[in-house]
Amino acid sequence: MHRYRSHTCAALRKSDVGSTVRISGWVHRVRDHGGVLFIDLRDHYGITQVVADPDSPAFKLAETVRGEWVIRIDGLVKARTEDTVNKTMPTGEIELYAQEIEVLSAAKELPLPIFGEPDYPEDVRLKYRFLDLRRDTLHKNIVKRTQVISSMRRHMGEVGFTEYTTPILTASSPEGARDFLVPSRIHPGTFYALPQAPQQYKQLLMVAGFDRYFQIAPCFRDEDPRADRLPGEFYQLDLEMSFVTQEDVWNTMAPLMTSIFEEFAEGKPVTKEWPRIPYDVAIRKYGSDKPDLRNPIVMEAVTEHFAGSGFKVFANMIASNPKVEVWAIPAKTGGSRAFCDRMNAWAQSQGQPGLGYIFWRKEGEKLEGAGPLAKNIGEERTDAIRTQLGLDDGDACFFVAGDPAKFYKFAGEARTRAGDELNLIDRDRFELCWIVDFPFFEWSEEEKKVDFAHNPFSMPQGGLEALQNQDPLTIKAYQYDAVCNGFEIASGSIRNQSPETMVAAFEKVGLSQADVEERFGGLYRAFQYGAPPHGGAAFGIDRIVMLLVGAKNLREISLFPMNQQAQDLLMGAPSVATPTQLRELAIRPVPPVKKD
C-alpha cells in the first residue's frame, strides 16, 4: 500500500465496503457521540467520515487529534445505516472504521476558523492565507479559476490561436497608470518596467507574421485598489489577430466567451447574440459605458416636456443653456411616495440637490400623476411623459436636468439604485454586450488639453483624414469593450498600423514625432517595414471568474492577493532593501516630503 494513501477523501463509495484502505488529510472536525469518536477527514478532493470506537487500537490516539492536524488513517470501509446516510456528500453512504492512525503534522491553535463564513478581519485572513485557502468556498473558487483558464486555452486553440509569451522586463510606456519600475544593476540609473499589458509586443508579433496570438498575460499597474481591481498584478486573456476588421474580432470572441460562460454558469442563462451598443447610446440610455443590462430601466430625454413649463427650475435651465437636457429614469412598480422619498434622500446623500419625481395612481377610473413636479407642469405634460415612457398605475419616474456630460454618471447611479431597490434585476443570468464607437480623444480638465480617451494605439475612424480635418473631440475610434452585468470584462480595438497616422494622433495630445520615436521606437520602426491591418482585445480573467462564482471582490478568487494598502501580509512585501542591494543598484533612498 502507498505510504500515505490508497484513496483520496472523496473516492470511497458503497462498492468499496469491506476493503481495507488508507487515506490522509486534515482533521476537519471531531465529534464525540457517546464515547465513539467521529472524525471528518478532508483533503483537496472531499471529506470522508472516520469512526474510532473504544475497542479500536486507534482510539487512544484519536482522542488526542485536533482540528487541522494532518493524519494518516488505515481502516475498514463499512456501509452506513440507512438513517445515517448523508446524501449531500459523495462519500455519504460509507464510513471508515479506523484501525491505525499516524499523526503526520500537528497544528497550533488556529488564528481563524477554516469553515463557515469568513467573518474575521481581512488582514488576518491575508496574513494566514494558507489557512484561509482551506475554506471550502475559497478553495473551490481557486480551482474554478484554474478550470476557466484551461477552458480559455482550449477554446482559443480550437479557433486557430497560438499561445506566445512576451517579456516581463520591458520599457516604461504610458498605458494610463503608473509603472512598477525595476532598477538595472548593469546600467546604473536606468530602470526596466513591468508590463501594464503586452500591447506593443503583441502588435509586433503581428508585424512579424504571427497571425493569431494569445497569452494568459500577467499585467502590472501601480494603481489604487478597488473591488473590481487588485493592487499590483492581474491576469488577462490577451489576443491579437491579423487582417481583421472589428466585426471579425467580435464574431470570433463573442461565441467563444459565451461558450466559456455557459460551461461555468451552472445553468444560468448567458447572452448568445451580444448587442453592439454605441458608446453615446450607452451613456444616454444607461448612464454608463459598462451598463448592467439585467436592469430593465432605460433612460430617455424628456426635455421638450419641461421647456416652457410651470416647473421653473428646469424651464429656466433649458431656456438659458442649449446644452441642458432633462433625462427621465422610469421606475416600474416604484409608484409609492415612500420609495420616491427614499430615492430623493439618497440623491441628497450623493451631493445632489434632490431627485424630482412623478408617480402615477388611479383615482377612480382616471390615471393621475402625483408629486410636486406633476402639479407644476400640469396634467397634459405629465400624461405626455407617461405615454412616452410606457408607464402605468403604480409606476414612477425620476428626473435629472443639466449638462449631460456632467450629470450622466449620477443618472446612471440613480438607474442602478432604483433597479436594486425595486428588485427589478434578475441576478441569475449573465448579460453580455459590446460597447463600440468610443471617443478617440477627450478633454483633460486637469491638464487643460486634449488627451487620449482610451488606447492610444487604436485606429481613429476616418484615419489620417479625420485627424487632419475634424475637431479631435468628435473623432471616434475603432475601439470596443465587452461588458457583463455592469462590469467591463474586456477592452480592444483595431490598431493604427500607419506611421503617419500614429504620429498625427500623438501630435493631437502634444507629442512630437521625436517623442513618438523615443517612447514607442520599436513599434514605430516596425510599422515602416510592412505592417498588416490588425486588432485584438484583452479579457480580464479575474473579473470573469469573480462574476462566474458570484464573489464580492477579487480577493475571493485570487491565491495570494495584497490588501487594500498594496501590502502582501503573508510574505512581508514590500520590504526594505539592504544597504548592499542599494549600493549594487546605485540607489540612494530619499525620504518622502511630508505634506503640511
Swiss-Prot record:
Site (Important for tRNA non-discrimination): 33
Record: residues binding ATP: 221-223, 488, 540-543
Position of the signal peptide: none
Location(s) in or outside the cell: Cytoplasm
Gene Ontology terms for molecular function: aspartate-tRNA ligase activity; aspartate-tRNA(Asn) ligase activity; ATP binding; nucleic acid binding
InterPro entries per UniProt: Aa-tRNA-synt_II, aa-tRNA-synth_II, aa-tRNA-synth_II/BPL/LPL, Asp-tRNA-ligase_1, Asp-tRNA-ligase_1_N, Asp/Asn-tRNA-synth_IIb, AspRS_core, GAD-like_sf
CDD domains reported in the protein's UniProt record: AspRS_core, EcAspRS_like_N
GO cellular component term of the entry, any: cytoplasm
Catalytic activity entry: tRNA(Asx) + L-aspartate + ATP = L-aspartyl-tRNA(Asx) + AMP + diphosphate
Domain of life: Bacteria
Keyword match Ligase: yes
Main location: cytoplasm
Binding site for L-aspartate: 175, 221, 454, 495
Keyword tags: Aminoacyl-tRNA synthetase, ATP-binding, Cytoplasm, Ligase, Nucleotide-binding, Protein biosynthesis
GO biological process: aspartyl-tRNA aminoacylation
First-tier enzyme category under EC: ligase
Region (Aspartate): 199-202
Pfam family, one: tRNA_anti-codon
Subunit organization: Homodimer.
Family under the similarity heading: Belongs to the class-II aminoacyl-tRNA synthetase family. Type 1 subfamily.
Function: Aspartyl-tRNA synthetase with relaxed tRNA specificity since it is able to aspartylate not only its cognate tRNA(Asp) but also tRNA(Asn). Reaction proceeds in two steps: L-aspartate is first activated by ATP to form Asp-AMP and then transferred to the acceptor end of tRNA(Asp/Asn).
Protein name: Aspartate--tRNA(Asp/Asn) ligase
